[in-house]
A protein has these predicted regions:
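Elongated, acidic membrane-bridging lipid-handling scaffolds
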Residues: 1-60
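Extended terminal
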Residues: 52, 65, 76-77, 82-196
Length: 196
């Protein structure tokens, strides 16, 4: 059997709250879980997960915002699993997942710059040709001088043998893959809204 070394993700919850925790509420009243914290080294995030506990299809909505992420912080996760390293910066990510027990749709928008991928062999040495090909098909910036958001919509199917958090991760991975691929027709661009 081939063994895989585990990748490491670090999530620290700073604050959290739950409202309407009971099966006595009637639709459309929803249970709402709100959390904020730190992802990996110092990336702030917040999330709002809502669902109707009486809905037999387990319909839910998960809204999240992830702040500035140095992509090199992700290498402790990516290198053991994928024999890859990344660098660059995701300035902001916003996403909404609407789904049920079986399938979901994620809408994700991201601002990013200077993205670069290095593919590695088993000895963790760079595969130069494959790395060059990978970088040729990736978006390295979301727009000139960071003035564009990349928006993407994609889907995920749930593996019923795994947890909701595996399902959430699958949505995010699918969304990020679509967003970073240059030649994918589902990606659209729009001007970033000016912050007040």
């Amino acid at each position: 059997l081939k063994q895989y070394q585990a990748g490491l993700l670090t999530i620290k919850i700073n604050n959290g709250g739950i409202t309407n925790v009971s099966n006595t509420y009637s639709s459309p009243e929803r249970t709402v879980i709100i959390v904020d914290g730190i992802f990996m080294k110092e990336t702030p995030f917040n999330a709002n997960w809502s669902f109707d506990i009486n809905n037999t299809d387990d319909q839910f909505k998960f809204i999240g915002h992830v702040g500035k992420l140095e992509l090199s912080d992700m290498n402790v996760f990516l290198t053991p699993l994928l024999n890859a390293k990344v660098k660059g910066e995701v300035i902001a990510s916003n996403f909404t997942i609407n789904g049920n027990f079986d399938e979901s749709v994620i809408n994700i928008s991201q601002e990013f710059k200077d993205v670069d991928v290095t593919l590695l062999n088993k000895k963790k040495k760079e595969k130069e040709l494959l790395s060059a090909v990978a970088n040729a098909v990736l978006n390295d910036n979301s727009g000139e001088k960071g003035n564009l958001l990349h928006n993407a919509t994609t889907q995920a199917k749930r593996d019923r043998t795994k947890s909701f958090f595996n399902y959430l991760a699958k949505n995010l991975i699918n969304g990020v893959k679509v967003n970073f691929l240059r030649k994918n027709n589902t990606v659209t661009k729009e001007k970033k809204k000016k912050r007040n």
